[in-house]
Regions:
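Alpha-helical cap/lid subdomain in secreted, periplasmic
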Residues: 123-262, 266, 278-280
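C-terminal motif of bacterial Sec signal peptides marking the signal peptidase cleavage site
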Residues: 20-24
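Bacterial signal peptide processing site
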Residues: 26-28
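Conserved SGNH/GDSL esterase-like catalytic core that processes O-acyl groups on lipids
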Residues: 58-155
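Short hydrophobic segments within beta-strands
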Residues: 50-52, 84, 180
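Conserved catalytic region of serine esterases and O-acyltransferases that act on ester linkages
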Residues: 256, 260-344
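Sec-dependent N-terminal signal peptides
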Residues: 6-15
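N-terminal module-boundary/linker segments of secreted carbohydrate-active enzymes
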Residues: 39-73, 319-322, 329-340
Length: 344
């Protein structure tokens, strides 16, 4: 893709997004220009996060702006979230796409300035375009669901190739890395049958683990401990997988948290977005869930999308418990105390 077309699309992206003024950024420096050495550097007011991922990233990031707008963003004036999406994308596919400069991605963009509406999107984006679209402060990597469970994912060099490309093309040389862990396969027959891409997808991906969710979780946890948690370059680790599994042990179950074999319901998406929010802002414990309603524009799994989804007190209790238990034990599934649906 030519340079002129890339620049044109970047301008279109900015026009479509229209969520506020982006921080200035030079290739050779961080946000804005170099400050005068005699003047104190101005503290950054906008937090910008980009995830290189898949539909699981879209699920998990979908309501971060909604959560952050409700819960507060500290000293920041704005939080901007970007998600570079390709369906079911694995790390090796990211390598293929960046090598060929393939415009195969969809870029999702959201902001706390528009916390009442879901991300805007733009198609036909390359990884380079996404990296250069903004001065991202945090760039998050994410393996595919099955990739996360095998040693080869962490040792075959693909992660290094992606990181090298990021460092060559990012606009902010001070950007740090994050790592996002996604959920494991559902074992509910109705949900596995609803997988939208291939009727054999569940069998192909989970048969090697004998359809054993606990085993899949253990395989993932072991790799996380050995390859990610021990690597200080991952400043942020976002274990949405743990929170999702915590919530599944509640009365909501798999059907209340997942809308098919792998994707999340609206409540599941909110749980994942709360984990992101807490990790980004260093929240150690939630004392309440301030999101009372999911605006209808955000809804995906709810049948009636003509009106906002009002959360029940039971759902809010499960959300807070699942997230808090994840903050305490990020790699351990903690059974819910809410195993019976409340009378509401």
């Amino acid at each position: 893709m030519g340079t002129i077309l890339k620049k044109t699309l970047a301008l279109v992206l900015a026009a479509v997004f229209a969520l506020g003024v982006f921080a200035g950024c030079d290739k050779g420096g961080a946000d804005s220009t170099e400050p005068d050495a005699t003047e104190p550097a101005e503290e950054a007011k906008v937090l910008k996060v980009l995830t290189l991922g898949s539909s699981s990233s879209v699920d998990s990031n979908h309501m971060i702006n909604l959560v952050a707008a409700a819960e507060g963003i500290g000293d920041y004036e704005e939080v901007m979230i970007g998600t570079l999406y390709y369906s079911g994308c694995k790390l090796y596919e990211h390598v293929q796409f960046l090598t060929q400069d393939s415009p195969v991605y969809r870029l999702y963009l959201s902001s706390t300035k528009t916390g009442d509406r879901p991300p805007e999107t733009m198609d036909d984006v390359t990884m380079e375009m996404a990296l250069k679209f903004n001065c991202w402060d945090i760039i998050v990597l994410q393996p595919g669901g099955q990739e996360a469970m095998v040693d080869e994912t962490y040792t075959n060099g693909n992660i290094g190739i992606i990181r090298k490309y990021v460092e060559e093309n990012r606009m902010n040389p001070l950007a740090v890395y994050g790592w996002h862990t996604i959920g494991v396969s559902s074992t509910d027959p109705e949900l596995t049958a609803m997988y939208p891409y291939s009727p054999n997808a569940y069998a192909e991906s989970a048969a090697k683990y004998n359809y054993d969710r606990e085993r899949m979780l253990n395989e993932r946890t072991e790799r996380m401990e050995r390859f990610v948690m021990s690597d200080p370059s991952y400043v942020y680790v976002i274990p949405t997988c743990t929170a999702v599994e915590n919530a599944i042990t509640s009365y909501l179950g798999q059907k209340g948290i997942k809308r098919d074999y792998t994707h999340l319901t609206d409540v599941g998406r909110l749980i994942a977005s709360y984990v992101w929010y807490c990790e980004l802002f260093g929240i150690e414990e939630l004392t309440e869930i301030k999101v009372d309603t999911i605006p209808k524009a955000f809804l995906k799994s709810t049948v009636d999308k003509s009106q906002d989804l009002v959360l029940t007190e039971g759902e809010k209790a499960v959300i807070m418990e699942a997230v808090n238990n994840t903050l305490k034990n990020p790699l351990k599934i903690t059974p819910s105390q809410y195993t019976q649906a409340p009378a509401e």
